């Protein structure tokens, strides 16, 4: 972006020194100059869109922040005691949990919890809601069938988080990210700018005091 700006500045100087340049040419160059700087300013303020984080449960891929509940319903999943036509309301009282948190099951087997969020309005039918958060179940055996960004969770150990970078563990390469670590919690935040324009993603890993896994989670945050 800086190189584009420098190029435009040099072009303006060169053309203004030439008395034979048409006014329309100068106007075009001036417009290009302003456009490039407005673009750079917007990118500085809002950042760049990050790649969404996929979660795979058995043979089903869920794009957190994009996949609708109807897609999982079609593949045999259920959400708590709710049906496809049930009303889901987003109370907008929490920065992390949007809509309603419900247990997700398939063939009477729990696969954790998901937040279902209406889009464009405060209340909508469950089938129209977007999945904005996923948390793995407490049953460690279920991790064999779950992956985050195509990384099998059953293969991960606490030692991995103590010795490796989170972006390497989950095989992501974001341009903008932040890491928060304690003895038991490891959080990778992708897109640290305000999430008014672009979605922010968080991959969360929580361990018990004995080093065993408590849960993994993926969430998408978005104000619009």
Name each model-derived stretch.
Residues 11-14, 20-29, 153, 157, ...:
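Low-complexity, repetitive regions of proteins mediating host interaction that are extracellular
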Residues 20-48:
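Internal/C-terminal transmembrane anchor helices
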Residues 70-137, 149-212, 219-224:
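A cross-family detector of function-defining hotspots
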Residues 58-71, 79:
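Extracytoplasmic Gram-positive cell-surface binding/anchoring modules and repeats
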Residues 1-14:
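Membrane-embedded alpha-helical segments of integral membrane proteins
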Residues 36-42, 127-142:
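Short, structured interface segments
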Residues 48-63, 142-157:
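Terminal, regulation- and interaction-focused segments at domain boundaries
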Residues 44-54, 83-84, 179-181:
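Long, compositionally biased, intrinsically disordered segments
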């Amino acid at each position: 972006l800086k190189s584009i700006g420098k190029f435009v500045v040099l072009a303006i100087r060169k053309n203004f020194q030439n008395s034979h340049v048409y006014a329309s040419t100068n106007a075009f160059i001036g417009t290009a100059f302003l456009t490039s700087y407005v673009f750079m300013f917007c990118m500085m303020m809002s950042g760049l869109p990050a790649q969404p984080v996929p979660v795979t449960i058995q043979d089903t891929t869920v794009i957190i922040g994009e996949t609708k509940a109807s897609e999982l319903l079609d593949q045999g999943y259920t959400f708590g005691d709710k049906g496809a036509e049930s009303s889901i309301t987003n109370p907008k009282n929490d920065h992390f949990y949007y809509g309603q948190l419900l247990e997700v099951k398939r063939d009477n087997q729990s696969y954790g919890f998901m937040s279902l969020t209406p889009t464009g309005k405060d209340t909508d039918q469950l089938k129209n809601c977007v999945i904005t958060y996923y948390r793995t179940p407490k049953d460690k055996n279920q991790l064999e069938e779950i992956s985050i960004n195509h990384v099998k969770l059953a293969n991960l150990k606490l030692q991995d988080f103590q010795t490796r970078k989170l972006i390497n563990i989950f095989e992501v390469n974001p341009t903008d990210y932040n890491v928060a670590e304690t003895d038991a919690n490891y959080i990778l935040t992708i897109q640290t700018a305000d999430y008014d324009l672009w979605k922010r993603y968080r991959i969360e890993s929580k361990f018990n005091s004995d080093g065993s896994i408590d849960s993994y989670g993926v969430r998408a945050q978005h104000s619009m």
